Amino acid sequence: LGRKAVVLNPPYSVLLQSKGLLKYAWDTHKYHDLLLAASFEEPLRYEKYVKKVLFGREGANVSIFDEVGNQISTRDGDYLRYRSIYQSFAQLARDPEGRYYQAGVFYAGEACGLGFRRGGLIIDNGASFVGHFVE
């Protein structure tokens, strides 16, 4: 086949990619300022919430609901075979043109990058990457 290298994710990466980690974090540190309520059983009541699949990618199979359960926004995808998780909604930063931003911090032994994904209410695979440089 002529391959010189094969790159595999280590098994623990599956844990870090699973949104089930969000529920575990919530269950072990309920009401922490930096965490959102999360549940496997049912949607959160009387508050805006998001339904996601455990192993979805780039906004696929994500839906946002208002406080009474009306769907506000949704994205189809190929991950419906996975279990769903419900999480409190957190409003992303928004610019004057109505675009939303999701921050990302990158580490390689130390903080080395800051970037934002810019897109719609559900950040998906059509989102732009907006890099930043900090001196």
Which residues does each predicted region cover?
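Domain-scale recognition of functional cores that engage charged ligands
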Residues: 1-135
